[in-house]
Design a protein with these regions (language model features):
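Phosphate-binding site of ATP-dependent enzymes
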Residues: 1-72, 99, 104-106
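ATP-dependent carboxylate activation and anion-phosphoryl transfer catalytic cores
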Residues: 70-152
């Protein structure tokens, strides 16, 4: 039916009902490091099941962001860092992952040009939750870019 309606190839994927995470990555190649893992927790009044545009744009009322350090979160960090390096991403960005029914993290997307709005973008939010300033985030991004350019 989807092929008939849209008249182009359609990608159908299984819904991942588990926890949703995002991890910041700073650096390039072997020098890349993962930030702490942030879990995206939707509040009762949020659109259910997904970190939608509406939920993100109204995050103060609809979303709770929290840093998590359990075993699943550690797997998320390792997967995110491995994907970042494998894709050849540089300097700074963000990886989104969501767990399946059994709690196994699945890669959803890479954001190699992650938003940098100090209050509304996930990468600065992670840094803030880690007790770091927006200026420290920008400093780390600039340091990575300068090192990469100087190492050419």
């Amino acid at each position: 039916m989807l092929l008939t309606v849209f008249k182009q190839p359609v990608l159908v994927e299984s819904f991942l009902p588990g926890r949703e995470f995002t991890v910041g990555i700073i650096g390039t190649g072997k020098d890349a490091i993962a930030t702490d893992t942030m879990e995206v927790c939707l509040k009762a009044q949020a659109e259910p099941d997904v970190y939608s545009y509406i939920n993100k744009e109204n995050c103060e009322e609809l979303v709770e962001y929290r840093l998590v350090y359990d075993e699943e979160a550690q797997q998320v960090r390792e997967t995110a860092l491995s994907a970042w390096r494998g894709l050849g991403c540089r300097d700074a960005g963000r990886m989104d992952l969501r767990s399946d029914r059994s709690g196994r993290p699945n890669f959803m997307e890479v954001n190699p040009l992650a938003g940098l709005h100090p209050q509304h973008s996930d990468l600065p939010i992670i840094f803030s939750l880690m007790g770091k300033t927006f200026h420290q985030l920008i400093d780390r991004i600039m340091h990575s870019a300068l090192k990469r350019v100087q190492d050419r």
